Amino acid sequence: MEGALRRTLNLAKPDDVYNALVDAHKGLSDAECRAFDARLILLLVNHIGDETVIHEALKGAAP
């Protein structure tokens, strides 16, 4: 599915993933949360590896 951002649910256990994200932030300061989020985003961007999809996601996440 290169070049197209998936906008439908693509997780078997989305609640588990959400809870893991929340748990990963527990006990972190605001600055540590931002640093963690930045590292996670960079890891996921590298894993995706498709610049078109990444740019679509950036546009979709913009306020």
Task: Identify the role of each PLM range.
Residues 24-29, 36:
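Active-site flanking loop/helix segments enriched in acidic
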Residues 10-11, 43:
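General helical structural elements
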Residues 35-52:
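Short, charge-rich amphipathic interface segments used for partner binding and complex assembly
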Residues 2-6, 12-16, 23, 31, ...:
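N-terminal intrinsically disordered, cationic/polar leader segments
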Residues 39, 62-63:
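Residue-level signal for alpha-helical context at structural boundaries
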